[in-house]
Each structure stands twice: as structure tokens, then as C-alpha cells.
Amino acid sequence: LSEKDKAEINAGVQHILSEIGFEQLPKFLESFIDNKTIIKKNNRFCFGLGLIDQCLKSFNNKILLHQQNKESYLELSKGNVYFGTGGAAPLILDYERKVYRPSLGKDLLNAARVVDGLDNLSFFSRPLVLTDISDPHLMDIYTAVISLSATNKHVMTSVANYKTVKSLAEVCYLIAGGEDAFRRSPFLSLNINFIIPPLRLDAEACEVMRESVKYGIPVMANVFGQRGASSPVSIVGSVCQT
């Protein structure tokens, strides 16, 4: 990107945040509407330029993703690139039978073990859905437990309900040897899809994000706008919305 492109993106982002805004503000944020930091315009919710500027100045451009052994970490900063897994596949190819079948807990365990032994993969973002557990709360907890038991590398997962976050945090505290130890070196983070393109907040996902911050679990905020469909067709416009 040229300096001109960067300036256009910055101006576009600030315009979207302060003038266009978002739909469906979560209830817990409604109390912050004060026409200064969070502003309501035509049933949409915008952010004040002062708040935007304050956030930009406070952002950390070096983030550490820790591992369980506390001896190594991933430094997310300029020039560093890492590869890992990802996705949420409900099916897996059964290599011996040459057919696809529902993914199970043992498959997630094996996938995490493989990643743990591969030097070219630096983190484990759960790639499979546990179809052998029907309860969403238990499925999210067991997904994390299985992943953490099979790899020392940083684990990324997700939860469907904000009430699950506390239970997940307690598991992490137990593994780390205490809450303070986990907060100092969090070896698990959550993928949260908090936006429904274009520019609608997902209330449930925002609740998950709030609980994650409360319990010291790092958050990776995912945005899935599609160029020309749920976001502008131009690269600059799509990046601005994202």
C-alpha cells in the first residue's frame, strides 16, 4: 500500500466508525450511549472521534501468544509471520475407508498431536467440530481440554455462549497453576466472530468477548466481509470496512 492508500484507509475507517456506525448494539453497551463516546444516529451506533483517537494511541503493536511450557511464545509484531491450523470442519476424511465421516474427539486429539510435532506450524486453532458431543457447552469445554492435552503450542478455539467462558477460564487456571499464572502467560485464546457483515454487531458474540476480557483470555476478533458481496468491491473499501 502506498502512503496515499494508507491515508485513504485511515480516513475511511474513521468515517465508518464515526458517521455510518453499526446496527444491533449489545444491551450491555447501551448504558455507554452519551453522545460523546458512543453516539446513536438513525438507529445506528457510532463512536466518537475522541474515543477512536484514544484507542489508536493505546493499541499495543506487539502481542505475545504464549505456550504451556512458558519457555517460548509467538511475538505478533511487524515482520513476524506464523502458520497454523484453522477452520471448524464437521467432517473428516477417513483415510483407510476413503470416505468422509463426522469428526470426533479422537480426531481432534490426533490433529493436535500432529501439529505439536510439526516445526512449520506454530499454533493450533481447532480445525474440527466434535460431533460426538451434542451439548454446546460441553462440546466447547472438551474441545479446549482435548486440544490443550495434546499440544504444547498456543491453542485457539471458540465458544458459542458467554456462560461457557467462566468454565473455560477455570480449566485454564487449573492447567496453569492459578489464575495469576494464566493471566501472565495465557496459552489459549478465543476466535470470536463478533460482526455480521455488513456492519452489524452480533450481540451473543460481543457478550463472549466481554467475558473473555473479564477472565483474562485473549481474543482474536474475526471479521468475514466478502468483497463485492457483504463489503465494497474495491480493496481499499473492503479493508476499511474490515
Descriptions of predicted regions:
Residues 1-106:
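Acidic/polar, glycine-rich intrinsically disordered N-terminal extensions of enzymes
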Residues 102-242:
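Helix-rich catalytic cores of soluble enzyme domains
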